[in-house]
Amino acid sequence: MRFLDIRDTNFDAEFAAILARGEETGREVEQVVLDIIADVRARGDEALLEYTRRFDRLEADSVAALQVTEDEIEYAFAKVKDEEIAALKLAVERVARFHEKQKQETWLSTTEPDILLGQMVTPLERVGIYVPGGKASYPSSVIMNAVPARVAGVGEIVMVAPTPGGEINPHVLVAARLSGVDRIFRMGGAQAVAALAYGTATVPRVDKITGPGNIYVATAKKLVFGQVGIDMIAGPSEILVINDGSGTPAHIAADLLSQAEHDELASSILITTDRGFGEQVATEVERQLAQLSRETIARTSWETYGAVIVAGSLDEAIAFSNRIAPEHLELAVANPFEILPRIKNAGAIFLGHFTPEAAGDYLAGPNHTLPTGGTARFFSPLSVDDFVKKSSIVYFSAAGLNRLGRDIVSIAEMEGLEAHGRSVSIRLK
C-alpha cells in the first residue's frame, strides 16, 4: 500500500504503477485468444468441447450435454435457502424497476407539413451474457446483465458460465431463472465468447455479448467486436473514496476491502484531506484484512494497488477523481450533494457515509456493470440502451420533397455526388 501526498512533486510517477495494472498481461494473451477464436470458428462444437475439457476440466460427449437442464434448475432451487431466494427476488425486482425508467419508445414528429421524422426503437433478437465463475460465484452478475436485457424486450437470452467440475453454483442458476435467462451453457473463456459470436451447431449466434470475465474473456470480446456488439472491455475492479475527515475509519476500510477481495489486480484508493484520518483507515484495513476468508487475494490487491492519498483540499480531491474516472466513487464527506455536481467522470457515485458501494453491487437498482480503467470518461454503465438498437425514420410526401429538394441538390453538388442530386431532382416538379 502506498501512502502518498498529491502535492509531492513525484506523486504522478508513484501513482503511475497503479494506473498501469494489467497492461502487460493484456498484450501477452492476444495471440492465444486469436488462435482459440479461429479454431472455434473453423471447427465449431468439436473445438468447443476440446477447450472445455482442457480449461474447465469438464468432460462431455457433446456441446448439447453442456446445456443446463430444467431438472438441474429445479434442483438448484431446492438447494438454495428460502431467505436467499427472497433476497435474489428482491434484487431482480429493484433492478427491473430502475431499468424500466431507462426505456425509450419509438417516436414520430409531425411538426413540419408533408414530412415525418422519427426514431424506431427495436430490441435485439438474441444476446449472450457471460457470467464469471473464477474466484467467486456471482449471481448478481446474472441479474445485472439479464434483467436489463429482459426489460428491453430481447427475444432470447443465452448465458455461458465456466464450471470447473461441471456444476454451476445453484445461486447462479436461481438468479438466471428469476432474471429470465432462456438457455444456459456450462462453458467459459475465450472459447465461449467465440461460440456466441460466430455460432456453432449447438450454440446459437448472438447479436451482442455482455458481462465481465478474466483477461482472456475481455480480450476475446475485444477481438469479436464488429462480428457482434459488446458492452465494454472491463478491466480489474476499482474504488476511489473521497473523504474530508468525517465519518468512521472502519467503514471506509471495509469499503476499500470490498473491492480488494475481488482479485489481486483490483485497486482500492482513499483520498482524504485529513492525514490523521487516512492513517486510521490504513491501520483499520490491516486489522480487517486478518478477518477475511479471502485475505490472500485482498492483501495482495491492497499491498500492490491500494493507496491512501492526502490532498490539500476537496478541490484537489475532486480534480484527481475526475482525472482517473473511477469505476466506483464514494463521496464519504459531510455534504456529498454539495460536491456531486462537480463530479464529471465516474461509473457509479455513492453518496454519504451510509451508502457503501456493495449496496450498488447487489440490489440498490442501478447496474453494477461499470466502466473501468479510466473509461468512465466516455463509457456508461450497462443499461437498457445496450440491448436495443435505434433506426431513423424519414418520410417525405411529394410536396415535402418539392419544398426542400433544391437545397438537397445544392449540398449534393457541393460534394460532387451527381447521382445523389439527380435522385432528388428527377422527382421535383
UniProtKB/Swiss-Prot annotation:
Zn(2+) binds at Q259, H262, D361, H420. PROSITE patterns: HISOL_DEHYDROGENASE (PS00611). Signal peptide: none annotated. Pathway: Amino-acid biosynthesis; L-histidine biosynthesis; L-histidine from 5-phospho-alpha-D-ribose 1-diphosphate: step 9/9. NAD(+) binds at Y130, Q191, N214. Substrate binds at S237, Q259, H262, H328, D361, E415, H420. GO terms for molecular function: histidinol dehydrogenase activity; NAD binding; zinc ion binding. The active site is at E327 (proton acceptor), H328 (proton acceptor). Binds 1 zinc ion per subunit. GO terms for biological process: L-histidine biosynthetic process. Catalyzes the sequential NAD-dependent oxidations of L-histidinol to L-histidinaldehyde and then to L-histidine. This is Histidinol dehydrogenase. It comes from Geobacter sulfurreducens (strain ATCC 51573 / DSM 12127 / PCA). The gene is hisD.
